[in-house]
Amino acid sequence: MPHSLRIGTRASPLAVWQAEHVRAALLRLHPGMAVEIITMTTSGDVLLDAPLHALGGKGLFVKEIEDALQQRRVDVAVHSMKDVPALQPDGLEIVAIMAREDVRDAFVSNTFLHPDALPEGARVGSSSLRRRAQLLERYPHLRVEDLRGNVATRLRRLDEGHYDAIILAAAGLKRLGLPDRITHLLDIDRSLPAVGQGAIGIEARSDDRRTRELLAPLADADTQNCVLAERSMNQVLGGDCRLPVAALARWQGPQMLLRGLVATPDGRRVLHAEAKGSDPVALGMAVAAALVAQGAAEIIEDVRNA
């Protein structure tokens, strides 16, 4: 068993919280281990002047960390699973996904208690085409404007009056000790979450057997299988965190229900599909096929080329 481990993570407060969460879990299992957290800046952290969907490329929030992992500058990478592309680099694998936090999106406003109360032309901040599409489907009178930066930056922009409301992941606010900033939690029927939202993934080198064995007990089997189904759907669609694609898998007794969504960014066309099954990969492929049959591939291609 190794006596030390280096965890690579983004430098944002939320990413560091996630790495500390993994570190604490490891130390509960191995109290004598030295676990170092190494922070680094990713392309997604630097390129803040353009919407995510306009930046191109995949893995905007993970590539530099995965590079460090491949170059053996760190032993483990910790990610928010919604940032991890459907296909991973050769030689790397997600070896554990921890128990999931709240999967829902949070409506945050200093003025309005619910999105239903937002008036014509109200400005809502979000960096996500997925959130934009689902908001505009229900509330076409809103102005959904791009909002980038870490959680504190986004909240500050709201508090400075640049937006009437913003949409954030509930998990991030709760993990940062800011549940009081949540004005209203959006039901998944209103805002289906991103693939892997609320789940922390731990990545290691495929050939590093000892580290993989060390991390395996941190996995939550139910979460891991649900995220696997969501990512299976996303892989077939060729989606990533920049695209208007959503999915959520949940166990219902011995079977899993997977719901999937693909939408045009303006919310005028929103495709839904769902299926039940016990094989996460097959389930994801089935839901993806149902979405493709409705025209999902064309929507995704149009967004990529926009």
From Swiss-Prot:
It is an enzyme of class 2 (transferase). It comes from the Bacteria. Tetrapolymerization of the monopyrrole PBG into the hydroxymethylbilane pre-uroporphyrinogen in several discrete steps. CDD domains: PBP2_EcHMBS_like (cd13646). The gene is hemC. This is Porphobilinogen deaminase. Pathway: Porphyrin-containing compound metabolism; protoporphyrin-IX biosynthesis; coproporphyrinogen-III from 5-aminolevulinate: step 2/4. The modification S-(dipyrrolylmethanemethyl)cysteine is found at residue 241. It comes from Acidithiobacillus ferrooxidans (strain ATCC 23270 / DSM 14882 / CIP 104768 / NCIMB 8455). One of its GO terms (molecular function) is hydroxymethylbilane synthase activity. Belongs to the HMBS family.
